[in-house]
Amino acid sequence: MADSTSMDHDGEQRGTKRKRDAGAGGSGAGIGKGTSNYVKEGYGPNMSEMVPRNIMNKGNHTVYHVVKQQKYLDFNYVSNQNPYIIPYQTAGFWASMWDQTDIGSNNTINIMKALNNVSVGVTWIKGEITFEVYAVTRQRLLTGTTNQTTWDFETSQNMFIADADREPENFNLATAAATGPLAQQTTQTLLFNANNDRYTKYELPQRNQYTREYDFQQLTNNYMWKPTDISAAANFRRLIPMAEGVYTTTAATTKMAELTEQKSVYAGSGKTTEASLFRNRTSYPRMHMAQPQVPDETGYMKFRYQVRMSTKLHLVFHLYPDYSTSTNIEYMGRQVLELPEVTATGGVVTCMPYEIKT
């Protein structure tokens, strides 16, 4: 005989229990059964589910948002064959800070700004950079001349991506323009020297997409990053979630300092929050876009690459509770950390190719 408690019927047979589901309809609706973890609200048949709005639990009351941008770039190696630096370590790189003219028309950036205003904190999930080479041209001397040049399409020529993943490197961060992919070229001319093993090179063929993903460091114990308009030029010194190593130029015993500074004191906290207490030290190698250094009659071959670059920045915004007031916002802010920031003087981003666990 079948188990009466597992039979799916409405009680036609005497001695069996009527099944009560939490769905709509019937006198058993909304009794509190079901598989959800939501809080029940209401009375009797009108009882409905309500999402708990507990600001101490980051899993609730959140909005997932992706900041997207797409640019067409001209990597020009005619006058300078040195590699370009892709400054993805800067927060402004992910929100077109280096191209202020296009920010206003980018709705994903505008949504990010709006969410910043209603959020107590932000969790950075990951970033994606996709490159696609759609045209390559080469400048060369016109046949039979010594000063007349022409341009040829090089359909078989590829571009190169190189990571400085065997030694620390750095780049300057003096202005908002320095957060752009066309702002800085390196001084190292030997990236493709046969004896150079400091860099790992990847070849990027034409009409192929190359995507790089960066998983950002996750804070623990409900700590969050402070909502910041990373498209504003005033915040150009801000970096993605990280901790950096420091060049020790004085002595081997010089302290390794965090580049994260917590400058604002929240009411009731009594002292500033030391961000280094909650994070391991991690960083990212310096990234370059380069051409092959092949000599010709004018020195090195002079290529120009037309590249489509698209980025995606995955963020989770932790919204204020429904009934937050100006007096308790500061209290909630005790678990919010400032994004890392380079100093105003010097302005050097140190790119560490390895992690330092503490």
Swiss-Prot record:
Its main location: virion. GO terms for biological process: clathrin-dependent endocytosis of virus by host cell; symbiont entry into host cell via permeabilization of host membrane; virion attachment to host cell. GO terms for cellular component: T=1 icosahedral viral capsid. Residues 1-15 have a biased composition (Basic and acidic residues). The keyword Iron does not apply. Capsid protein self-assembles to form an icosahedral capsid with a T=1 symmetry, about 22 nm in diameter, and consisting of 60 copies of size variants of the capsid proteins, which differ in the N-terminushe capsid encapsulates the genomic ssDNA. Capsid proteins are responsible for the attachment to host cell receptors. This attachment induces virion internalization predominantly through clathrin-dependent endocytosis. This is Capsid protein VP1/VP2. The lineage of its organism: Viruses, Monodnaviria, Shotokuvirae, Cossaviricota, Quintoviricetes.
